[in-house]
Curated annotation (Swiss-Prot):
Residues 1-35 are annotated as: Disordered. This is Probable transcription factor At5g41765. Belongs to the GeBP family. Residues 1-13 have a biased composition (Basic and acidic residues). It holds the Pfam family GeBP-like_DBD. Keywords: Transcription, Transcription regulation. It comes from Arabidopsis thaliana. The keyword Transcription applies. Disulfide bonds: none annotated.
Length: 152
């Protein structure tokens, strides 16, 4: 993904002396998803609409369907890894914006792709974080139940 110069100073634009040096800071409006990621998500929704099958149930069919949307040749294991990374990005984003999870578009995408209820996934991840923070206290125990799957 091409990134624009994130530290373009007014001096450089107005003809001032000196060269702007990148600071490595992210701009507020910087994109987090590439066009390939967006196309893959759109094609998953199209797959669900056309075949009435969940992409997570029919991974081979989803791969064959999505293969036409993706411009590069990939193997099925690479496709599965890409879907896992998209899932991780989506869960992380939903964890940050934890207000009213069930009505968001990200929640619907997560249910469509992985059949997990977003609220239970976020609760599960928060539980894992709590477990990591309290590993020095063996007397504290947590319920290690997996997130709930939704029936679509």
């Amino acid at each position: 993904m091409d990134k624009a110069n994130t530290n373009r100073s007014k001096k450089e634009v107005c003809g001032g002396s000196g060269e702007a040096k990148p600071t490595g800071k992210k701009r507020k409006n910087e994109r987090t998803l590439t066009n390939k990621n967006v196309n893959a998500k759109k094609s998953m929704m199209d797959f669900k609409a056309l075949t009435r099958h969940n992409p997570s149930d029919d991974m081979t069919g989803a791969y064959n369907f999505l293969h036409e949307y993706i411009s590069v040749d990939v193997y099925s294991y690479e496709f599965v890894e890409k879907m896992k990374s998209l899932k991780k990005k989506l869960i992380e984003k939903m964890g940050i914006n934890a207000k009213d999870l069930s009505s968001s578009i990200g929640s619907e995408l997560l249910k469509l792709i992985w059949r997990y209820d977003v609220k239970s996934v976020v609760e599960y991840n928060l539980l894992k974080i709590e477990q990591a923070n309290f590993t020095s206290h063996p007397q504290i125990s947590f319920n290690n139940s997996e997130p709930k799957k939704t029936n679509l």
